[in-house]
Amino acid sequence: MSEVILGRTGITVNKNGFGALPIQRITKEQAAALLQQAYDGGITFFDTARAYTDSEEKLGYALSHVRSHIYLATKTAAQTADDFWKDLETSLKLLKTDCIDIYQFHNPAFCPKPGDESGLYDAALKAKEQGKIRFIGITNHRLSVAQEAIDSGLYDTLQFPFCYLATEKDLALVQGCKEQNMGFIAMKSLSGGLITNAAAAYAYADQYDNVLPIWGIQKKEELEQFLSFIKEPPAMTEPIRAMIEQDRKLLSGSFCRGC
C-alpha cells in the first residue's frame, strides 16, 4: 500500500482520496452505501465542497459514525468574511462534525492573505483559533495563483489539477509544495475523463511521494477498481510508460483544468 503525508499537516493516508463531487448525481442511500464501502475498503480521505449541492449532507449522513477515523476536506467559494462564516457553519452542520480537517478556499481569482480587503484569510485564522478547522488550504486552476499560494507560506495544502498530461510548470508546483512542506492534493487525475486507464493514472501519481490523488467516484465498479489499488498499487511498467507517452502526444494541450 502506498501512503502519502500531506506536508506539515501530518495527515497520512493511502494514495486514494475520495472526490465527492459525483455523489451529487446519485441518491442519498446510494451515496451512503458507496461511501461506507470506500471506508471499509481503506479510503479515509474525503474531499467535498459547499458548492457541490448535497454532497456534504450525504457525507455527513454516511460517515458521521466513523468521524474520528477519517479526514474531511471541504471548500468555500465565499468572497467576503460574512459569507465565509455562513459557509463554514453550514458545512459543519451538514458534515455532522465540530471541526473540518482541511478547509479550502475554492478556486479564488486571487490568493487570500492576512489583512487584505476580502477578510477571508483572517476569517480562516479565526476559525482555526476557535477549533472549527484544523488546516487552511486553497484550490485553484490558475498556475499564477497556485504559485503565489506556495510562495506565501500561508497555506497547509494546495489542490490543483495534476495527471500524466501535466506540464513542466505543473510539476514545478508539486516540487514547490514539497520544498515548502505543503500538502499537494491532485484533482482531475483522470483529466476530466480524457484519461481512461486508471491504473496508469495511479502509477504516474505514485511516482510523486507528496501527491494525493482524489478520484471522482459515483459508481460501485469505479470504487472497486480504486480499492484494488490499495492492495496492489499499479507499478510504472514499460507498457504503461509507453501508453502514457502515446497519450501525451495525442492529448497534449487538452488537459482539463475546468470543472
Where are these regions (language model features)?
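Acidic (Asp/Glu)-rich catalytic clusters
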Residues: 7-10, 40, 59-68, 89-98, ...
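Conserved, mostly hydrophobic/aromatic
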Residues: 6, 18, 46, 59, ...
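Alpha-helix-loop-beta-strand connector modules within alpha/beta enzyme cores
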Residues: 56-75, 122-131, 179-182
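A structural motif
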Residues: 40-43, 97-100, 133, 155, ...
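Short, acidic/polar
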Residues: 25-38, 81-96, 140-150, 196-202
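Active-site groove signature of glycoside hydrolases
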Residues: 92-112
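N-terminal binding-site loop/beta-alpha segment at the start of enzyme catalytic domains
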Residues: 1-70
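Beta/alpha (TIM)-barrel catalytic core signal, keyed to glycine-rich beta->alpha loops juxtaposed to Asp/Glu
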Residues: 108-258
